[in-house]
Amino acid sequence: MVKDSDEIYMKRCLQLALMAEGNTFPNPMVGAVIVHRGKIIGEGYHHKAGLPHAEPNAIYSVKDQSLLKDSTLYVSLEPCSHYGKTPPCAKLIIDKQIPRVVIACLDPNPLVSGRGVKMLQEAGIEVKTGVLESEARRLNRRFITFQEKHRPYVILKWAQTADGFIDIAREDIGSGPIKISNGVTKTLNHQLRSTEGAIMVATRTALLDNPHLTTSKWSGNNPVRVVLDRRGIIPETNKIFDNRATTLVFTTKEGAEKHLIQRSNYLNQNKIKSIPETDKDLFFEKGNGIKKLFENDNIEYITIDFETNIVKQILDNLYHYNIQSVIIEGGSMWLNTVINSGLWDEARIETSKSIINTGIKAPFIDGIEIKSEIIGDNIIRILAPKK
């Protein structure tokens, strides 16, 4: 087949894969198409972790299985070669005697990482790789970053006025920020949350905005909520502690001790059972280990050193917590800290036409614009780091 037709069928694989966005964690999104003499005879995609992969879904969708011996299988990610929750896809392809396989990109997972291709080639199957590779890697940027860089994919996100401010200067706790996003972009922000592993804010944002950080405006999974609280000053009545989603608090030993007392009082009032005192002691001996302080509670505390490489410490902990992506929403100082660390992958900046003349300056970022979209009176720009 000519290159153009290979790309056409691979585009369809990517379209299929995207249908499961937000549902396949911790697995990547994968789509597969089977073509016989220029006609698509089978399609499939991976719906959810633990369910069949894209390749068997496509293979078993073919009504006349005898046609597989004269067909090409297109798949957006290298077929797996190991036994996990499902059997290896490479073995099924071999068993079905499919003579040609076209792959967009290799799987960076060490359990696969070229082994699927090798297995197919050793069985005499013609294998072609690298068709729409950059598009396929972009689709699974969270999974690939997690596997290759051993940290979550980091998305910076904020809304700013036309004159470069993200908010007015304010001190009233719970007063909420000025309105910059419009109704549509607010909904899209919640849609984004449903596709990412975690969402993070710093102490001041949690105090002043008192945000839920959930997907209340979109039907989907809530991300893990992450908050910085060095001194343990965020009250237990804050919405971020409402148990609607797992919440990780990065703090110090002193901050954790404060939360321990405050949380104990709060949960006892709400008749939630406290864990044994010995387990609480273990937490403090363990240092920066992730530990729940109470039974039936979704709040967990992680102690870190706030004086050294704070961004890396947080990302390392999120990696060990198996979080593949995180949205960092604020505040401006924390966003600038992450930007200056160089440990970010994407910035989503919404700009309105409003002008406020003074307030909290938006973060400074120097990146490459990869996409922009006008939504109502606002424009959303997506930036990537300069290489």
Describe each PLM feature range.
Residues 117, 133, 137-140, 186-193:
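Hydrophobic, well-ordered secondary-structure segments
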Residues 2-27, 43, 62-63, 153-387:
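Enzymes that bind and transform nitrogen-containing heteroaromatic metabolites
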Residues 28-30, 132-135, 330:
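Short, conserved alpha-helical segments within structured domains
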Residues 34-136, 224, 255, 339:
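Zn2+-dependent cytidine deaminase-like catalytic core
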